[in-house]
Amino acid sequence: MVHATSPLLLLLLLSLALVAPGLSARKCSLTGEWDNNLGSNMTIGAVNDNGEFNGTYITAVADNPGNIKLSPLLGIQHKRACQPTFGFTVHWNFSESTSVFVGQCFIDRSGKEVLKTKWLQRLAVDDISDDWKATRVGYNNFTRQRTVEE
C-alpha cells in the first residue's frame, strides 16, 4: 500500500540521485604523506602524466629495527579513475629485501582518503633450499597524515 508519505519518499530519492554524483566525483590522490596501521610513514611525490611517481618509505616494522633507514619507492597508477589502482616497489636501504605493494585509493564514507594495499616482501636467502621462507605476504591500510590546520 502507498500512503501520503510517497511524495516525501520520492523527494528523498530524487535528492539522493542529485547529490550522489557529486560525492563520487571527488578524486582520490596518492600525492602526499601517509601513515599505515602499523605506524610506518610514506611520502608520495607528484604523479606525472604517465601515472608514474616516486617517494620515500620509513617502516615501523623490521627484523632488525635498530637499522631502519628511509627507503626509496617507485610506482605507477591509473590516472583516469576517481579511485585509482596503483602499484609501487620499495627498495629497502637497510636490508637485502624488496617489497611490492598493489592497491586502490578510496574515498571512504566520511570523505577521507584511504589506501588499501596488499604487499609481498622478498628477503634474500643464501641457498635455494630456503626459498620457501623468503617471501612474506600482508596488507596495510594507509590514511593521509593530518596537517597542522586539521
Curated annotation (Swiss-Prot):
UniProt keyword annotation of Glycoprotein present: yes
Predominant cellular place of this UniProt entry's protein: secreted
Gene Ontology cellular component terms for the protein in this record: extracellular region
Domain Avidin-like: 26-147
GO molecular function: biotin binding
Disulfide bond as UniProt keyword: yes
Annotated biotin binding sites: N36, S40, Y57, T59, D63, S95, S99, N140
Record's subcellular location: Secreted
Pfam families for this protein: Avidin
Glycosylation sites: N41, N54, N93, N141
Signal peptide region: 1-24
Keywords: Biotin, Disulfide bond, Glycoprotein, Secreted, Signal
PANTHER family: AVID PROTEIN-RELATED, AVIDIN-RELATED
Subunit structure: Homotetramer.
Family under the similarity heading: Belongs to the avidin/streptavidin family.
Protein name as annotated: Avidin-related protein 7
Native species: Gallus gallus (Chicken)
Gene from which this protein is expressed: AVR7
